[in-house]
Protein backbone atom coordinates (compact mmCIF):
# COMPACT_ATOMS: atom_id res chain seq x y z
CA UNK A 1 0.00 0.00 0.00
CA UNK A 2 2.84 2.39 0.79
CA UNK A 3 4.30 1.82 -2.69
CA UNK A 4 0.89 2.67 -4.17
CA UNK A 5 0.88 5.97 -2.21
CA UNK A 6 -1.86 4.84 0.19
CA UNK A 7 -1.69 5.79 3.84
CA UNK A 8 -2.38 2.67 5.88
CA UNK A 9 -1.98 1.21 9.32
CA UNK A 10 -1.63 -2.54 9.83
CA UNK A 11 -1.83 -4.67 12.96
CA UNK A 12 -0.79 -8.21 13.83
CA UNK A 13 0.94 -10.38 16.41
CA UNK A 14 4.64 -10.23 17.21
CA UNK A 15 5.24 -13.98 17.06
CA UNK A 16 8.43 -15.11 18.76
CA UNK A 17 8.88 -18.03 16.38
CA UNK A 18 7.99 -18.24 12.71
CA UNK A 19 6.56 -21.46 11.31
CA UNK A 20 9.94 -23.07 10.85
CA UNK A 21 13.41 -22.73 9.42
CA UNK A 22 14.68 -25.39 7.03
CA UNK A 23 18.09 -26.98 7.51
CA UNK A 24 19.93 -29.83 5.86
CA UNK A 25 21.23 -32.36 8.36
CA UNK A 26 22.91 -35.62 7.34
CA UNK A 27 21.66 -35.06 3.81
CA UNK A 28 18.02 -34.61 4.87
CA UNK A 29 15.86 -31.54 5.15
CA UNK A 30 14.63 -30.92 8.67
CA UNK A 31 12.45 -28.19 10.11
CA UNK A 32 13.45 -26.34 13.28
CA UNK A 33 11.80 -23.39 15.06
CA UNK A 34 12.72 -20.01 13.56
CA UNK A 35 13.67 -17.81 16.53
CA UNK A 36 13.75 -14.62 14.48
CA UNK A 37 13.81 -12.36 17.56
CA UNK A 38 16.76 -14.06 19.24
CA UNK A 39 19.11 -11.16 18.49
CA UNK A 40 16.48 -8.42 18.51
CA UNK A 41 15.02 -6.66 15.51
CA UNK A 42 16.43 -3.19 14.80
CA UNK A 43 13.46 -1.89 12.79
CA UNK A 44 10.86 -2.19 15.53
CA UNK A 45 10.09 0.31 18.28
CA UNK A 46 8.63 -0.94 21.56
CA UNK A 47 5.76 1.34 22.67
CA UNK A 48 4.81 0.32 26.25
CA UNK A 49 3.04 3.65 26.80
CA UNK A 50 0.29 2.35 24.48
CA UNK A 51 -0.12 -1.06 26.17
CA UNK A 52 -3.64 -2.47 26.41
CA UNK A 53 -5.16 -5.11 28.67
CA UNK A 54 -6.92 -7.96 26.87
CA UNK A 55 -9.45 -10.09 28.77
CA UNK A 56 -10.38 -13.70 28.00
CA UNK A 57 -13.48 -15.45 29.29
CA UNK A 58 -15.28 -14.54 32.48
CA UNK A 59 -18.75 -13.10 32.80
CA UNK A 60 -20.44 -9.71 32.90
CA UNK A 61 -22.32 -8.54 35.97
CA UNK A 62 -24.86 -5.73 35.56
CA UNK A 63 -25.60 -3.29 38.36
CA UNK A 64 -27.36 0.02 38.64
CA UNK A 65 -25.16 3.14 38.51
CA UNK A 66 -26.91 5.94 40.46
CA UNK A 67 -24.51 8.62 39.13
CA UNK A 68 -25.42 7.87 35.50
CA UNK A 69 -28.95 6.75 36.22
CA UNK A 70 -28.45 3.58 34.20
CA UNK A 71 -26.80 0.21 34.06
CA UNK A 72 -23.10 -0.39 34.66
CA UNK A 73 -21.44 -3.49 33.21
CA UNK A 74 -18.62 -5.13 35.17
CA UNK A 75 -16.43 -7.84 33.63
CA UNK A 76 -15.31 -10.42 36.21
CA UNK A 77 -13.71 -13.85 36.43
CA UNK A 78 -11.55 -13.37 33.35
CA UNK A 79 -7.93 -14.11 32.49
CA UNK A 80 -5.93 -11.15 31.20
CA UNK A 81 -2.69 -10.37 29.42
CA UNK A 82 -0.97 -7.09 28.63
CA UNK A 83 -0.68 -6.31 24.91
CA UNK A 84 2.54 -4.39 24.23
CA UNK A 85 2.75 -2.71 20.80
CA UNK A 86 5.86 -2.67 18.62
CA UNK A 87 5.77 -0.30 15.65
CA UNK A 88 7.61 -1.03 12.41
CA UNK A 89 7.90 1.40 9.50
CA UNK A 90 6.73 0.13 6.12
CA UNK A 91 8.25 2.29 3.40
CA UNK A 92 6.92 2.76 -0.09
CA UNK A 93 9.10 2.23 -3.13
CA UNK A 94 10.24 5.37 -4.93
CA UNK A 95 8.03 7.70 -2.88
CA UNK A 96 7.89 9.35 0.55
CA UNK A 97 5.07 7.25 2.02
CA UNK A 98 5.84 5.47 5.29
CA UNK A 99 3.08 3.45 6.93
CA UNK A 100 3.11 1.71 10.30
CA UNK A 101 2.77 -1.97 11.06
CA UNK A 102 1.90 -2.37 14.74
CA UNK A 103 2.56 -5.86 16.04
CA UNK A 104 1.42 -6.84 19.52
CA UNK A 105 3.44 -8.84 22.02
CA UNK A 106 1.75 -10.42 25.04
CA UNK A 107 3.09 -10.14 28.57
CA UNK A 108 1.60 -11.35 31.84
CA UNK A 109 -0.22 -8.83 34.01
CA UNK A 110 1.40 -10.49 37.04
CA UNK A 111 4.72 -12.20 36.32
CA UNK A 112 4.65 -14.79 39.08
CA UNK A 113 2.11 -15.57 41.79
CA UNK A 114 4.30 -16.31 44.80
CA UNK A 115 1.29 -16.96 47.03
CA UNK A 116 0.09 -19.78 44.74
CA UNK A 117 3.62 -21.18 44.52
CA UNK A 118 3.98 -21.21 48.31
CA UNK A 119 0.71 -23.15 48.57
CA UNK A 120 2.05 -25.79 46.18
CA UNK A 121 -0.11 -24.71 43.23
CA UNK A 122 2.83 -24.45 40.84
CA UNK A 123 0.64 -24.48 37.73
CA UNK A 124 -1.39 -21.48 38.92
CA UNK A 125 1.81 -19.66 39.93
CA UNK A 126 2.87 -19.37 36.27
CA UNK A 127 -0.58 -19.41 34.65
CA UNK A 128 -0.46 -15.73 33.60
CA UNK A 129 3.01 -16.11 32.13
CA UNK A 130 2.03 -19.24 30.21
CA UNK A 131 -1.13 -17.64 28.81
CA UNK A 132 0.87 -14.68 27.49
CA UNK A 133 3.67 -16.85 26.11
CA UNK A 134 1.31 -19.25 24.33
CA UNK A 135 -0.48 -16.42 22.50
CA UNK A 136 2.68 -15.07 20.84
CA UNK A 137 4.99 -18.07 20.77
CA UNK A 138 4.24 -19.62 17.35
CA UNK A 139 2.58 -18.48 14.15
CA UNK A 140 -0.32 -20.78 13.24
CA UNK A 141 -0.45 -23.49 15.89
CA UNK A 142 -1.60 -26.90 14.73
CA UNK A 143 -5.38 -26.71 15.02
CA UNK A 144 -6.41 -30.28 14.25
CA UNK A 145 -7.30 -30.64 17.96
CA UNK A 146 -9.34 -28.61 20.43
CA UNK A 147 -6.36 -26.94 22.17
CA UNK A 148 -4.99 -25.71 18.82
CA UNK A 149 -8.37 -24.29 17.78
CA UNK A 150 -8.73 -22.55 21.15
CA UNK A 151 -5.23 -21.05 20.92
CA UNK A 152 -5.79 -19.78 17.38
CA UNK A 153 -9.05 -18.13 18.49
CA UNK A 154 -7.24 -16.53 21.45
CA UNK A 155 -4.51 -15.25 19.13
CA UNK A 156 -7.04 -13.67 16.79
CA UNK A 157 -9.08 -12.19 19.63
CA UNK A 158 -5.88 -10.88 21.28
CA UNK A 159 -4.70 -8.76 18.36
CA UNK A 160 -8.19 -7.62 17.34
CA UNK A 161 -9.02 -6.53 20.91
CA UNK A 162 -5.71 -4.70 21.38
CA UNK A 163 -5.94 -3.06 17.94
CA UNK A 164 -9.54 -1.89 18.45
CA UNK A 165 -8.72 -0.54 21.91
CA UNK A 166 -5.81 1.41 20.39
CA UNK A 167 -7.93 2.77 17.53
CA UNK A 168 -10.71 3.88 19.88
CA UNK A 169 -8.24 5.49 22.31
CA UNK A 170 -6.60 7.37 19.42
CA UNK A 171 -10.01 8.55 18.17
CA UNK A 172 -11.08 9.72 21.63
CA UNK A 173 -7.99 11.94 21.95
CA UNK A 174 -9.32 14.22 19.20
CA UNK A 175 -13.07 13.57 19.19
CA UNK A 176 -15.79 13.62 21.83
CA UNK A 177 -18.60 11.66 20.16
CA UNK A 178 -17.78 7.96 19.82
CA UNK A 179 -20.97 7.56 17.75
CA UNK A 180 -19.21 9.35 14.88
CA UNK A 181 -16.26 6.94 14.79
CA UNK A 182 -17.51 5.46 11.51
CA UNK A 183 -16.90 8.83 9.81
CA UNK A 184 -13.13 8.60 10.29
Predicted regions and their residues:
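A conserved ligand/cofactor-binding region detector
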Residues: 2-184
